[in-house]
From Swiss-Prot:
Molecular function as annotated in GO: exodeoxyribonuclease VII activity
Compartment annotation: Cytoplasm
Subunit structure: Heterooligomer composed of large and small subunits.
Function (record text): Bidirectionally degrades single-stranded DNA into large acid-insoluble oligonucleotides, which are then degraded further into small acid-soluble oligonucleotides.
InterPro entries the UniProt entry points to: Exonuc_VII_S, Exonuc_VII_ssu_sf
Protein name per the record: Exodeoxyribonuclease 7 small subunit
Entry's Gene Ontology cellular component terms: cytosol; exodeoxyribonuclease VII complex
Biological process per Gene Ontology, one example term: DNA catabolic process
Catalyses which reaction(s): Exonucleolytic cleavage in either 5'- to 3'- or 3'- to 5'-direction to yield nucleoside 5'-phosphates
Family: Belongs to the XseB family.
EC number: 3.1.11.6
Length: 71
């Protein structure tokens, strides 16, 4: 059974990919594959952050008006 990884788990995976690529000891084919995987993770993480931001923007103040947050 496949469960979706948490934001933190996906971020950790992206950080590990970046570290491996920065070290430069990855064969070219693997580096390309890791780069592509990293780009997918990056886009997914960005979507998660944007969704969280939209949720936070809708937080209501005590008087019932929406709290505006700078993007």
């Amino acid at each position: 059974m496949s469960t979706k990884k948490t934001f933190e788990e996906r971020l950790q995976e992206l950080e590990a990919i970046v570290t491996r690529l920065e070290n430069g000891d990855v064969p070219l084919e693997e580096a390309i594959s890791e780069f592509q995987k990293g780009m997918v993770l990056s886009k997914d993480l960005q979507k998660t952050l944007q969704s969280a931001e939209k949720t936070l923007v809708k937080v209501m103040q005590a008087d019932g008006t929406e709290l505006e947050m700078d993007a």
